[in-house]
């Protein structure tokens, strides 16, 4: 039996690696660089096309618990991320190019057959297993085949933030600080008074946007909502979103600014910064004009403009079984954002679940469902079995795990205990290599 993994993104790379080190014959299909997408810039595997942040490391945050669960699984992606971390307060952020380089290196050294070409359809095969992990930038031709196969798909749109050079920032205005003084001052802050905010706001809501083919506002996922759309929902909306000043004190005045634009390190060398929460579909000239209205960024050099792109996912509740296989073709699995999970590590988690069950099937064992007491189990239960027939993409969050008044540390403790027991029962750890994957880089 061969396992074909379609897409070398975060989930596809994780799956291919985990199955290969367990002795399965793995063929990884990736169309880049022979065919690029509108948002990818390199030929590396696991390229991060939106933020470089993998979110909070705190166990009190859902993403923190998810990371602990991935560590129990032995996640390659998380180990490489920690190896490529850049300072980001309580969050885990990475040097995106170094991260993708290291993942690519490991994949190429793991005995995986790599095929660089666009796959337009899945051929009929009675023996092989196929895992579709093509992600949010699935090619049009493959999406057409997929539409015929599942009878349903949906489109929504992602937007990414601009990146500027560090040496074009005016540090006499911009200052380092974390909210409430908690952290390592990893963020730069551009303060605004009310007049400056009003000027910025008026320019933003009146700026020209790029038309996006088939754009439907209702199918835009909230986290990547363009800043201009947030602004148009109300003049103060940005003050409760990406420009929230709460807990940030300007050392020049000793006071909290009216509004704050935050900048986060984009690489280890600290030569680049992304503008946090400034995903946009504005025309490039408009982006340049509006960014330079931000105090301290009057001479900002923009090395990547914000862009918006189509994002594809299936209605997993209708077409997948509890093990993420097609109901009408159990040789085809799905993983990653195409299933309706949202977020980098959420995609990895779905991939690990699929990999575990493909590994069990290869040993003639029955697939298993994850405990519902775990973050990963609750997330996948939501996308596979939610009561609403219309699936909206979902992040890991504690709300999936029961009443809001539950003690999060106790919930996390139970989740990790139950996952450890599950992984022991499933014999997952017995099949894997446990040494530090990135040793020697």
UniProtKB/Swiss-Prot annotation:
Its main location: cytoplasm. NCBIfam families: gid_trmFO (TIGR00137), PRK05335.1 (NF003739). GO terms for molecular function: flavin adenine dinucleotide binding; tRNA (uracil(54)-C5)-methyltransferase activity, 5,10-methylenetetrahydrofolate-dependent. Its cofactor is FAD. One of its GO terms (cellular component) is cytosol. InterPro entries: FAD/NAD-bd_sf (IPR036188), MnmG-rel (IPR002218), MnmG_N (IPR040131), TrmFO (IPR004417). Pfam families: GIDA (PF01134). The keyword Phosphoprotein does not apply. Keywords: Cytoplasm, FAD, Flavoprotein, Methyltransferase, NAD, NADP, Transferase, tRNA processing. GO terms for biological process: tRNA methylation; tRNA wobble uridine modification. Belongs to the MnmG family. TrmFO subfamily. This is Methylenetetrahydrofolate--tRNA-(uracil-5-)-methyltransferase TrmFO. SUPFAM superfamilies: FAD/NAD(P)-binding domain. Catalyzes the folate-dependent formation of 5-methyl-uridine at position 54 (M-5-U54) in all tRNAs. It catalyses: uridine(54) in tRNA + (6R)-5,10-methylene-5,6,7,8-tetrahydrofolate + NADH + H(+) = 5-methyluridine(54) in tRNA + (6S)-5,6,7,8-tetrahydrofolate + NAD(+); uridine(54) in tRNA + (6R)-5,10-methylene-5,6,7,8-tetrahydrofolate + NADPH + H(+) = 5-methyluridine(54) in tRNA + (6S)-5,6,7,8-tetrahydrofolate + NADP(+). Its EC number is 2.1.1.74.
